[in-house]
Amino acid sequence: MGKIIGIDLGTTNSCVAIMDGTKARVLENSEGDRTTPSIIAYTQDGETLVGQPAKRQAVTNPQNTLFAIKRLIGRRFQDEEAQRDKDIMPYKIIAADNGDAWLEVKGQKMAPPQISAEVLKKMKKTAEDYLGEPVTEAVITVPAYFNDAQRQATKDAGRIAGLEVKRIINEPTAAALAYGLDKEVGNRTIAVYDLGGGTFDISIIEIDEVDGEKTFEVLATNGDTHLGGEDFDSRLINYLVEEFKKDQGMDLRTDPLAMQRLKEAAEKAKIELSSAQQTDVNLPYITADGSGPKHMNIKVTRAKLESLVEDLVNRSIEPLKVALQDAGLSVSDIQDVILVGGQTRMPMVQKKVADFFGKEPRKDVNPDEAVAIGAAVQGGVLSGEVKDVLLLDVTPLSLGIETMGGVMTPLITKNTTIPTKHSQVFSTAEDNQSAVTIHVLQGERKRAQDNKSLGQFNLDGIQAAPRGMAQIEVTFDIDADGILHVSAKDKNTGREQKITIKASSGLNEEEIQKMVRDAEANAEADRKFEELVQTRNQADHLIHGTRKQLEEAGDKLPAEDKTAIEEAMKGLEAALKGEDKAEIEAKTQALVQVSGKLLEMAQQQQAAAGGDAGDTSAKKEDDVVDAEFEEVKDKK
């Protein structure tokens, strides 16, 4: 069996590693570097360049040099992040026919996985050159907060590159594997703070060692899929553009060539300011006007850079608090803090993290290589090369379906260990309902519309039955890659529908954070909404039952009683159209009072009929949840 290689497919740089005996080894590419810039260029003569060669020619070919593609993978064109990148990137971001964010290069439409595949091909070739044999299998890492669409798109990129992706694993988890495997760490709880080129993750991970077997269990994860070194670069670039404009009265944003030179200079200055207190951004002949050439020479201090990016660093602190809270731990429970990602070399980032956790982060983990090493370790586990290691990862957000009253009913809660499978039985909302719509949601809010829609499908051909009698079993199955499969089965007929959720629109981090923040800020509003839905459902049940009893009673019920009941029902139905819980409760009570005689008659009939009704009701399964489907008619 061939090697399963480990690939860290990064926003800014990528890295490949393999298991060499019991140790993971990071491989050098054809240029002799251990990391490869995630940059792809399409030249005028039809050549595709990847890595350092692509980076070197970027200044002369800015429109056809693509970088930070990971920020677009699995995203919709209308996503806020894609729109933001569209305005600042030198290359052209367009809407695909299905609404995804794609790119246009030399008049040709290209999907982000197609472009990322070029980087993966280079990683594959690097491993093949070292091993002297073909490589067909890989473990690829993704940010822990990547959603279904982004994970699926990453797998697609692997397939395009000629790799069978054996497992998608989360970057902080991979870093924990790299840290924990070769150290006699015993039982420890660690925090992995991963601030890379385009994404940010925090994971709280417990490492347990029992009889020589190490278990890496993720307790909680959080993050921001659109926060990273690229944003830090953008802040510095904007500052330099504004300073040059003040000094020379010219806006460099209109000159793609100048902006590409500026991008390189800003990235270099940012890196230098991690070790120096000040640096010069010196770009002669940056542009020209009628009076002649213009030169840029601007001094940038570390303090200035820190003031430009302070809010970005602070944005990474809030997810730390949420992750600890979700794990049920306090700062004092964390024994080690590991920094991953090139941006964590910035002293300000290190200080903020140290201040938050009350301890210095470890310096013995290489922030650029740890993730690829962890991916190689996981590859070794899958191929059997590495024994006595068990990895337990989690899903970052709750997953559920929409049930009657517009409620989100979770089937799998956030931070559940994966792979996992959960089934729940639901029923129909109307008599003789022949179809139900399974609307799959992701998020933390009670109201369905406040969560992210992942997709929906219909289960039709349901056997005609009174409301509440049909048994619809919904199963959520998350595989080890964190990809969701949903099925719905009519237990009476055995009819089943399945889908793999391939959300064409991915959840972005800001939406996720907003959901979590909203869930906390609106806990009271959610509680009231839940109570209102319960009151509505009880009233609805009462109307349905009363109407049925009226039909059965026929002429046996005095006319004045029948009129009073019908009036009370009308009043309750009118109240149900509003949002006033107290009003619905009052009208429900009024209907209960006037339908007393009807209830007596129904009880007498039941007594006369003996225990038959009891027998049929007993057949209903115990685990049926009191939440029902309404059929959603597809918009034509």
Curated annotation (Swiss-Prot):
The modification Phosphothreonine is found at residue 199. Belongs to the heat shock protein 70 family. Pfam families: HSP70. Acts as a chaperone. It comes from the Bacteria. Residues 603-636 are annotated as: Disordered. NCBIfam families: PRK00290.1 (NF001413), PRK05183.1 (NF003520), prok_dnaK (TIGR02350). It comes from Yersinia pseudotuberculosis serotype O:1b (strain IP 31758). The keyword ATP-binding applies. The gene is dnaK. Keywords: ATP-binding, Chaperone, Nucleotide-binding, Phosphoprotein, Stress response. CDD domains: ASKHA_NBD_HSP70_DnaK-like. This is Chaperone protein DnaK. One of its GO terms (molecular function) is ATP-dependent protein folding chaperone. Induction: By stress conditions e.g. heat shock. The lineage of its organism: Bacteria, Pseudomonadati, Pseudomonadota, Gammaproteobacteria, Enterobacterales.
